[in-house]
Amino acid sequence: MAVREVRLFGDPVLVSRADEVVDFDESLSTLIDDMFDTMEDAGGVGLAANQVGVLRRVFVFDTSHQEGGLRGHVINPVWEPLTEDTQTGKEGCLSIPDVSAETTRYETVRLSGQDRDGNPVGFVANGLLARCIQHETDHLDGVLFLKRLDPAERKAAMGVIRASAWFNK
């Protein structure tokens, strides 16, 4: 297991759609383990494979610090909202350091996918975990949370990014 480099805003891999996983092999298990290490090292609650430069439809999550929270991974994730109810809250991203903004997401979603052995998995999530599922699946579709912001919030976020030391290396 290893901590991998988190790709930052501006890297083309972050705006590329990840490929479906068809081979459930040792390299996939290693990727998942490395993603957990990377997420934990960075202090995140979720991480998509393209954030570590791998275009495979995999994400890991850990909301176990909250009551009823879970820790796990999902391969080839698909989600659907269970109601039209939404939540709005601060959202950030390991690939866009120092930027957080109010983002609206569905409150409750049903997630389905596969585990590292190819077995079906699924559950209903709400709150932070539902937000995480939507955020990480967006990543796998090549969509950054900045696209979910209203124009004024996006402009402010882009100003912070352009002024940041990490972006101007």
From Swiss-Prot:
One of its GO terms (molecular function) is metal ion binding. The active site is at E136. Keywords: Hydrolase, Iron, Metal-binding, Protein biosynthesis. Fe cation binds at C93, H135, H139. Binds 1 Fe(2+) ion. SUPFAM superfamilies: Peptide deformylase (SSF56420). Gene3D superfamilies: Peptide deformylase. It is an enzyme of class 3 (hydrolase). It comes from the Bacteria. GO terms for biological process: co-translational protein modification; translation. InterPro entries: Peptide_deformylase (IPR023635), Peptide_deformylase_sf (IPR036821). The keyword 4Fe-4S does not apply. Belongs to the polypeptide deformylase family. This is Peptide deformylase 1. It comes from Corynebacterium glutamicum (strain ATCC 13032 / DSM 20300 / JCM 1318 / BCRC 11384 / CCUG 27702 / LMG 3730 / NBRC 12168 / NCIMB 10025 / NRRL B-2784 / 534). The lineage of its organism: Bacteria, Bacillati, Actinomycetota, Actinomycetes, Mycobacteriales. The gene is def1.
